[in-house]
Amino acid sequence: MSCATLPAEARLHRPSEFTAALKGRRLARGALFIVSAAPATSAPACARLGLVIAKRYAALATTRNAIKRVLREAFRHRRQALPAQDYVIRLHSKVGPLSLTALKRAARTEADAHFGRIAR
């Protein structure tokens, strides 16, 4: 397996982890996403990611999956620079009638901006 992948320990798995991060501090809000964070609860302190992409905001499964892929990839690239916290990225508004390519570009641009701001 490649060392460039996002390992299982870098993701949130339990509902309690998601709840704690969502109740934590809101770090960023953009046109599409809200980023919330809480102190890391895992033993090896590292940045971990959870995604909440609701069907009400992105009706098609292909759209939801594309958004999740783009967000995971953006997080994977910035993971080492981020503080050791549990992050949850939540889609908070309806996705407009964009092509999948335009949606991926918009999601990546916003994710990079949020992670860049958090890493500073």
From Swiss-Prot:
GO terms for biological process: tRNA 5'-leader removal. It comes from the Bacteria. Gene3D superfamilies: 3.30.230.10. GO terms for cellular component: ribonuclease P complex. Signal peptide: none annotated. PROSITE patterns: RIBONUCLEASE_P. One of its GO terms (molecular function) is 3'-tRNA processing endoribonuclease activity. Its EC number is 3.1.26.5. InterPro entries: Ribosomal_Su5_D2-typ_SF, Ribsml_uS5_D2-typ_fold_subgr, RNase_P, RNase_P_CS. Pfam families: Ribonuclease_P (PF00825). It catalyses: Endonucleolytic cleavage of RNA, removing 5'-extranucleotides from tRNA precursor. Keywords: Endonuclease, Hydrolase, Nuclease, RNA-binding, tRNA processing. Belongs to the RnpA family. RNaseP catalyzes the removal of the 5'-leader sequence from pre-tRNA to produce the mature 5'-terminus. It can also cleave other RNA substrates such as 4.5S RNA. The protein component plays an auxiliary but essential role in vivo by binding to the 5'-leader sequence and broadening the substrate specificity of the ribozyme. Consists of a catalytic RNA component (M1 or rnpB) and a protein subunit. NCBIfam families: PRK00038.1, rnpA. This is Ribonuclease P protein component. It comes from Bordetella avium (strain 197N). The gene is rnpA.
